[in-house]
Amino acid sequence: MAETKPEIEMSEEERKIVKISSLKKKAINASNRFKNSFKKKGRRSSSRVMSVPIEDDIDAEDLQALDAFRQALILDELLPSKLDDLHMMLRFLRARKFDIEKAKQMWSDMIQWRKDFGADTIIEDFDFEEIDEVMKHYPQGYHGVDKEGRPVYIERLGQIDANKLLQVTTMDRYVKYHVKEFEKTFKVKFPSCSVAANKHIDQSTTILDVQGVGLKNFSKSARELLQRLCKIDNENYPETLNRMFIINAGSGFRLLWSTVKSFLDPKTTAKIHVLGNKYHSKLLEVIDASELPEFFGGACTCEDKGGCMRSDKGPWNDPEVLKIAINREAKCSPISEDEHKHVDQGRSTSGFESLERIKKKTDEDNVYEKQIATIDKSMDMAWLAKTQKAENFPISKGLECYVRKGAPKKGDGLLVGGVMAFVMGIVAMVRLSKDVPRKLTEAALYGNSVCYEESTKSKQNQGQFAAPVSSSEYMLMVKRMAELEDKCMFLDLKPAHVESEKEEKLQAALNRVQVLEQELTETKKALEEALVSQKEILAYIEKKKKKKKLFFGF
């Protein structure tokens, strides 16, 4: 019996060692697959359109963070093959400022939400039949691309009628429609824009038209809908906003914005440009006139498609571009383990270029290969003994993917839904503060710039900004606004006239006040007359005293 106990303890220890070894093996395999993430299966196609080089903007620092994040997800079994996308993981890292633990928690919550909501199959399963009626009460959608190839998203907030919107559909159905459109954007629109622009695109440019926005657009139902959309966007589709233009902003809006922006993250405010009614030149600097609707100062009308807001204009409508975009082989995604072994065993197989041909590449390609080899070496310090040298990365004949050296990082920011909810809140507060002095408004308008500084200047002044508004404070503000609205609605429901008895009492009280005021005036007048008489008597007495002194003095 004395010998069996140590044997049992030893077997438990061995099980722990085996478990740790298996986890470490997974991490090693993940690192190896990550290094080959820019390899693709070869394809045999004679189409000239299929050969499209797409430039990638992931730099060396991001690659190292991605490697660590990807290994952490694999060790926790949080990386299904359909979500094994480097750019998607990078967006979650940026949303949590490259904090791997926070990003992993956000990623885990996103996976659970997709299972519960059914986001993976919502494009096929959900049919939004009432879209025509919905667009009448909530005009929004994509129209064209900006000069850098990003899709342009437009919302005309002043034309939103939440009450009529919820008469033609339900809030749950509209939320499903919103998620479906987001899924289509990532599966169709962004890939199509990437093919058309020859570079990876996963962000959009947004235009919010706030002309005519008031309290009617910010009802209780509208706030509830926007809060749900904001929550979904921020938690499951982070970092999709590149820049936002808020146009037709009135003086009160800009005055309040100049105050509110000091409480926001500088990276967020750098993305938001608040413009008045002279916004056309600013939009045309970013968006070509042929891609901008006529009602925004552009040249596009989309008459044959029912107007710009219904046309869904963009490169995703080009059959050739769409064919490449929806083809999984046209994406830069990590290859499977079997493919990795196949590449290692036979580099000269169909679909891959031979090593001799790689060595004859241009000097620019050699720079990229050296950079990737350097990154591989830094990421494999833990297993340096097992790795002799970094592998060469063959480039596919079709859709070429490489890392651009020194690519700029994108800043953190809010999503369209979140910013839209915040904008609606600001507009509501502006409408409630109409008695702000005009001189104060003019001082804010002519003392500050309407279009705010770019990210380079905001970074220099980061120390001057206060801490951003937390979500709890924002929700508290929204709650108080809801309570205020309920009180206003309660007062509106009361009858405008007062009961006759109360009115008579009130009138009698007013008459009594008038009588008292009249009596007070008369009393005041009598008192003044008495004071005058008293002064005359005192003066007469003084005069008599002086005469008496003179008489006895002689």
Swiss-Prot record:
The keyword Transcription does not apply. This is Phosphatidylinositol/phosphatidylcholine transfer protein SFH1. The keyword Transport applies. The lineage of its organism: Eukaryota, Viridiplantae, Streptophyta, Embryophyta, Tracheophyta. It is found in: Golgi apparatus membrane; Cell membrane. GO terms for biological process: cell tip growth; protein transport; root epidermal cell differentiation; root hair cell tip growth; root hair elongation. Predominantly expressed in roots. Detected solely in root trichoblast cell files engaged in root hair growth, hydathodes, shoot apical meristem, and apical cells of the root cap. Required for transport of secretory proteins from the Golgi complex. Catalyzes the transfer of phosphatidylinositol and phosphatidylcholine between membranes in vitro. Plays a role in root hair tip elongation as a key regulator of polarized membrane trafficking. May promote the PtdIns(4,5)P2 synthesis and organization in root hair membrane. Residues 498-539 form a coiled coil. Gene3D superfamilies: CRAL-TRIO lipid binding domain (3.40.525.10), N-terminal domain of phosphatidylinositol transfer protein sec14p (1.10.8.20). Residues 130-304 form the CRAL-TRIO domain. It is a peripheral membrane protein. Keywords: Cell membrane, Coiled coil, Golgi apparatus, Membrane, Protein transport, Transport. One of its GO terms (cellular component) is root hair tip. InterPro entries: CRAL-TRIO_dom (IPR001251), CRAL-TRIO_dom_sf (IPR036865), CRAL/TRIO_N_dom (IPR011074), CRAL/TRIO_N_dom_sf (IPR036273), PI/PC_transfer (IPR051026). Belongs to the SFH family. Its main location: Golgi. Pfam families: CRAL_TRIO (PF00650), CRAL_TRIO_N (PF03765). Disruption phenotype: Exhibits short branched root hairs. It comes from the Eukaryota.
